[in-house]
């Protein structure tokens, strides 16, 4: 076959024709541009300006807990600070703390002519609840971990925190701040560094050692001012800045859950445990913070990070001397508003206060030069000379003068929204006496944004001091964002909120938080939210510790709590004290101890309990004294006039009768009943050797006790005790005995209940499981003068048994004078919002300092939104705001209208009361604007 030869040009033309036929552009240059040059090739290797290269952070040094800067010598330390609670504080107290803070700034740093120390304070509101939720989960006692009740609580609190931190806030606070209230944590961070030039002199410390010395002084001074400084590790620094420069990552999705997952995945990797070499690239600390290239916008003066515009607004000058806590402290605003300037700033604002520790001789020389230049008789010259003399005078009185700057970082989704936030910020600052630089007057806004980032500012390069201004150390202390709202101890046994939406955590059951005991007194007038608060506290403590709860109540305020606990796997035992209920309390059952341990029988006078010194010596139970109180209640019926008739001789005979009954019943091997003590009294009364008057008195007392041996009272007080089953929650409804006319029966029943709890505490004291005896409506129970001394007697040693006495009341008027030792014994006081006259009533039972009175008077309540209160203990003194999840509010509703709402749902839908309460909670979520989540499922619903 003959091969056919084709010309190469024909093949190329056919190739081009085929491409044209398919609509594909022809290959090759389609323009007449010049060929590439060597210069064009070189530009391939040129790097564009880098945002990250302007940041000085190179490497975290774990040995010195410092961040190495770009010069390879300078190091910086990062701290996270607690804040000083300013709510309800008096001016004198605030001034003392401010002076301590001022002294810390003045005394912690060495003043250097070259390379001075720089202090930067940053404050911002964050809604990242991850660290708290992880801390809460880790804090749960092993006994409660994994239980249905605990997991339900952890999920509920997580959903609640996410719901209340929505943009715009959960509600408008029209009573206190007149601003939206939003769940958020105000985080305050401190950065300390000094730029080093050249090699240190022979007598100088190395940069790391010098930083360590300064940080130790600074932390000690802050602690003296009541501020805890916690050193930030590399991961914590990285997490903070990662969120700053990546505010809206969408690599894994655009929702909050996806963003949180991104932050977790992008965390600084842990050092390898194996002996492997580090990577040769991408280990720069600053480079690891960026997952998108920042873009500069010189036209609008913003940086675009993650597609969001960022801007900084710098303070031009102070128009008036700042007050204590000027920016972040709670102060009066206008007629009746009480808030902080920072509360009024736009969301996502970051405050930065920079202070340069300037030598005083340099500043004095500058002042002298300024004074010499102010010549002439013009008004400006005279004013300048006066200001210079005043400044020199203040420096001479140990008020140091430094240089400083104040900046505010803003961000939003669009330029228009960012401009609106800038206007909002400027208005808030101007109203507070702070004049910001107008955005259009900022010469180099992109540089300013970089300048006030951590560790970027170098005082040596600011030769003309254009970017800082003179600032007294006292004014810096007033402006510092360490003023704020209380945060508690950090132990999340109980979690509440403050007025700014931040968390308050404390734990009476944690021995690090208590100094004496975990006994608790909760007082709240009618309508203050006492039932809801106590319900919320019990839910939290039960979820964290799974204690044994004994709840004594009148009015079924905790019936739904018991149903809820039972639906989640806790065992519940209910007792109702009413005729025909089949309950027997056996008030003299402990009399057998008098025979078993006769050497331990105490004969102390009950009145001696008013003496604190004698009370402190009571390391063992006074069983005989306790039983005497029970017998006296039966004899006198709880009536004051009958109690006054009792003489010391009568009391001695009562004790003798109890001992006689105990010995007789021990011989018969049976428990002591009320009738046995009655018979012992009659036996002594029938003794012919006794004086006639004594015999008559004894028979009268026996007849009085006989009332408890017949009729309805016999079933409850004159039978063998009914054994209590093992249960997580024991709910005792006082029923009939909570009414008027049953004072004696109520007191005796309560004593018997406390005895039963005490016996369980003694039996299980080695198991390590706490017991909490909760008494609601305490004013009904403790109004009997004999009962409070008894409670002091028996609960004095509960600290050793791990049992705690919690008392709640809404009425202080019914508490007798004898209740004072009982209330003084209690370390933890929670006082809900109350009128001024109630504060005065509290002072009857507890000495209140002026600061504590001021705190109590400042607590408020807004129906349907929140209730406030004050926590007082040996280690805490703070104001809190209760904003519980809707579920816990629904379980504590005791008003008639609220009960009717549940009853209507039960009738309409044929569900249990607990299921009706869960539905009420869902309706409350809708009213509060909380997004509906998956239905709450319990066994009872």
Model-derived features: positions:
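Extended, folded cores of ATP/NTP-driven motor/assembly subunits in large transport
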Residues: 2-473, 480
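Anion (oxyanion) recognition and catalysis
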Residues: 223, 430, 542-543, 799
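Conserved P-loop NTPase motor cores
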Residues: 502, 508-540, 549-552, 556-558, ...
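Short, structured coil segments at secondary-structure junctions
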Residues: 545, 568-570, 825
């Amino acid at each position: 076959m003959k091969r056919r030869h084709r010309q190469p040009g024909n093949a190329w033309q056919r190739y081009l024709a085929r491409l044209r036929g398919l609509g594909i552009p022809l290959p090759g240059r389609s323009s007449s541009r010049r060929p590439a040059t060597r210069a064009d090739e070189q530009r391939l290797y040129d790097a564009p300006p880098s945002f990250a290269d302007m940041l000085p952070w190179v490497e975290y040094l774990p040995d010195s807990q410092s961040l190495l800067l770009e010069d390879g010598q300078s190091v910086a330390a990062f701290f996270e600070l607690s804040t000083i609670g300013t709510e309800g504080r008096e001016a004198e107290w605030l001034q003392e703390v401010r002076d301590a803070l001022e002294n810390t700034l003045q005394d912690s740093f060495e003043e250097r002519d070259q390379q001075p120390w720089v202090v930067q304070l940053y404050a911002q509101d964050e809604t990242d609840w991850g660290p708290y939720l992880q801390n809460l989960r880790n804090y749960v006692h092993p006994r409660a971990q994994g239980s249905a009740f605990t997991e339900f609580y952890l999920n509920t609190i997580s959903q609640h925190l996410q719901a209340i931190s929505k943009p715009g806030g959960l509600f408008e606070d029209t009573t206190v701040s007149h601003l939206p209230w939003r769940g958020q944590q105000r985080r305050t961070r401190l950065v300390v560094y000094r730029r080093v030039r050249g090699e240190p002199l022979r007598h100088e410390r190395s940069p790391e050692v010098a930083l360590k010395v300064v940080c130790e002084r600074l932390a000690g001074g802050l602690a003296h001012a009541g501020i805890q400084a916690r050193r930030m590790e590399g991961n914590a620094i990285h997490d903070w800045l990662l969120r700053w420069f990546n505010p809206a990552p969408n690599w894994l999705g655009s929702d909050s859950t996806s963003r949180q997952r991104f932050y977790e995945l992008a965390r600084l990797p842990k050092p390898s445990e194996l002996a492997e070499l580090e990577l040769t690239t991408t280990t720069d600390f600053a480079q690891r913070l960026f997952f998108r290239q920042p873009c500069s916008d010189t036209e609008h003066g913003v940086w675009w990070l993650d597609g969001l515009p960022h801007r900084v607004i710098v303070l031009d000058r102070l128009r008036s001397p700042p007050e204590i806590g000027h920016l972040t402290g709670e102060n009066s605003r206008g007629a009746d508003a009480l808030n902080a300037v920072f509360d009024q700033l736009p969301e996502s604002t970051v405050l930065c206060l920079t202070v340069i520790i300037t030598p005083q001789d340099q500043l004095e020389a500058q002042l002298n030069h300024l004074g010499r230049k102010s010549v002439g008789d013009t008004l400006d010259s005279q004013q300048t000379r006066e200001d210079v003399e005043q400044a020199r005078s203040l420096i001479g009185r140990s008020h140091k003068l430094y240089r400083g700057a104040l900046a505010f970082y803003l961000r939003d989704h669009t330029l228009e929204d960012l401009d609106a936030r800038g206007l909002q910020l400027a208005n808030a600052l101007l109203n507070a006496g702070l004049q910001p630089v107008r955005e259009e007057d900022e010469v180099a806004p992109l540089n300013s944004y970089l300048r006030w980032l951590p560790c970027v500012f170098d005082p040596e390069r600011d030769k003309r001091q254009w970017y800082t201004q003179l600032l007294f150390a006292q004014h810096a202390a007033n402006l510092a964002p360490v003023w704020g709202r209380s945060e508690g101890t950090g132990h999340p046994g109980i979690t509440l909120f403050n007025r700014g939406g931040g968390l308050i955590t404390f734990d009476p059951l944690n021995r690090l938080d208590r100094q004496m005991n975990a006994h608790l007194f909760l007082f709240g007038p009618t309508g203050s939210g006492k039932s809801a608060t106590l319900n919320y506290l019990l839910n939290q403590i039960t979820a964290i510790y799974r204690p044994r709860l004994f709840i004594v109540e009148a009015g079924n305020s905790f019936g739904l709590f018991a149903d809820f606990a039972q639906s989640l796997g806790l065992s519940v035992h209910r007792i109702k004290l009413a005729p025909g209920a089949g309950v027997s309390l056996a008030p003299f059952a402990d009399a057998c101890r008098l025979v078993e341990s006769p050497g331990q029988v105490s004969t102390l006078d009950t009145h001696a309990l008013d003496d604190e010194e004698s009370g402190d010596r009571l390391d063992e139970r006074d069983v005989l004294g306790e039983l005497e109180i029970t017998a006296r209640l039966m004899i006198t019926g709880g009536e004051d006039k009958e109690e006054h008739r009792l003489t010391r001789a009568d009391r001695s005979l009562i004790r003798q009768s109890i001992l006689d009954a105990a010995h007789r019943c021990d011989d018969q091997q049976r428990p002591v009943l009320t009738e046995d003590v009655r018979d012992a009294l009659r036996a002594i009364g029938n003794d012919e050797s006794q004086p006639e008057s004594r015999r008559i008195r004894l028979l009268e007392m026996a007849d009085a006790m006989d009332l408890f041996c017949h009729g309805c009272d016999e079933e409850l007080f004159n039978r063998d005790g009914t054994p209590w089953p093992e249960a997580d929650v024991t709910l005792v409804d006082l029923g009939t005995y909570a009414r008027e006319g049953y004072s004696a029966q109520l007191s005796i029943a309560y004593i018997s209940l406390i005895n039963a709890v005490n016996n369980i505490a003694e039996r299980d004291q080695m198991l390590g499981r706490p017991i909490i005896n909760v008494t609601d409506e305490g004013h009904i129970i403790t109004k009997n003068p004999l009962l409070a001394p008894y409670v002091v007697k028996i609960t004095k040693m509960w600290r050793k048994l791990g049992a705690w006495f919690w008392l709640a009341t809404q009425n202080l008027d019914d508490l007798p004078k004898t209740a004072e030792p009982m209330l003084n014994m209690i370390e933890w006081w929670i006082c809900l919002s109350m009128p001024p006259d109630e504060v005065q009533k509290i002072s009857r039972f507890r000495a209140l300092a002026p600061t504590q009175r001021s705190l109590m008077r400042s607590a408020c309540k807004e129906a349907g939104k929140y209730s406030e209160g004050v926590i007082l203990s040996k280690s805490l003194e703070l104001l809190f705001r209760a904003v519980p999840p809707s579920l816990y509010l629904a379980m504590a509703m005791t008003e008639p209208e609220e009960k009717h709402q549940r009853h209507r749902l039960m009738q309409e839908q044929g569900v249990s009361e607990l299921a009706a309460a869960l539905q009420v909670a869902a309706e409350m979520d809708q009213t509060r604007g909380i997004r509906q989540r998956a239905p709450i499922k319990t066994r009872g619903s």
